C-alpha cells in the first residue's frame, strides 16, 4: 500500500506522532449538498416552532447559499454574505468550507434536541441566530458562546440525559444517579486557557450544591480551544483523514498537558472532568474531501472520593457520542 511521509509543521509542540500515513484506496462517504439544504430547512422549522423568526438572520442566508449550490448556479456569496468580506474568503472553496462548518454545527445541535428538548432552550435559540455569519469573523461573543453551550448540550441529549438550560449554570445534565453542572468557555488564546478554566471552576463553586434532585453533584468544564490550536479560527487541511485527525489530537494533548495539574488541583472544588474540543473545517488531499471535525480530549479527575469513579464511568456514554458519530458530515 502506498505510504506518504508527513511532518506536521503546523502543530504546537507535541509528543511524537506517526510519520507515515497509508493513502486511502476508497473515497470517504459524503453527503450531497441537498442534504445540508434539507437539514437547514428542518432547523428553520424547528426554530419557528419555538417562536424564533429566521428572517434576515444567518440561518436564512445559509439557506439562500445552499439553494444556489444545489441547483448548480454560480453562488453569489458576496451578495448573500454582505457583511462577511475578509481576505480569508479568496475562492469558492473557502466560502464552501466556512459555510459547511457553520451548517454542520447547527445540524449537530439539532440532532440532540430532536431527541430531547431541554428546559430553557427557547431563550438560548434567540441568541443562537444572532451573530456574524461565520465564526472566524464573529465579534458578538454572546452568540457563539451560546452556540458552544448548545453544541455540548446536544451530546448529553443524544446520550439520554435530562438537560436543563434554564438556570444560571450553562448546562445541568442528569442521569439516574448523578447531576453534572457544566460550565462552557470559549478560549481565545493559549494565554487564556488557565484563566478560563479558573473562571469556570469559580462559577461552579457558586452554583453547584453537593446534591441536586437527590443526586450527587459534580462539576464539569467544557473548553472550546479551537482558537488556541488555530489562531486564525478558520480552515485546516490534512494529507489523509487520519493525518488531519492526528493534527487535532496532538494539539489537544499539548493543550491538556498545560492544565492537567490545574484540573487535579480543583478536586477540592468538585471538578470531575474537563473536556477540550476543537471544531474546524478540514480540506483532505487523499482522497479529496471536505469535512467538519469535532475533535475531543478529556482530562478526568481521579482525586475525588466517594462516588466520583462511578460518575466518571457514567459519563463514558457521552464520550461515546463524540467518538462514534454515524454521520458523514461530522468527523471526530
Say what each PLM segment does.
Residues 159-171:
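Short, well-structured beta-strand/strand-turn elements
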Residues 163, 187, 227-228:
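Short, solvent-exposed loop/turn segments at secondary-structure junctions
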Residues 156, 171-173, 178-190:
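Conserved catalytic cores of phosphodiester-cleaving nucleases, focusing on short active-site segments
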Residues 168, 183-184, 193, 233-235:
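A short secondary-structure junction signal
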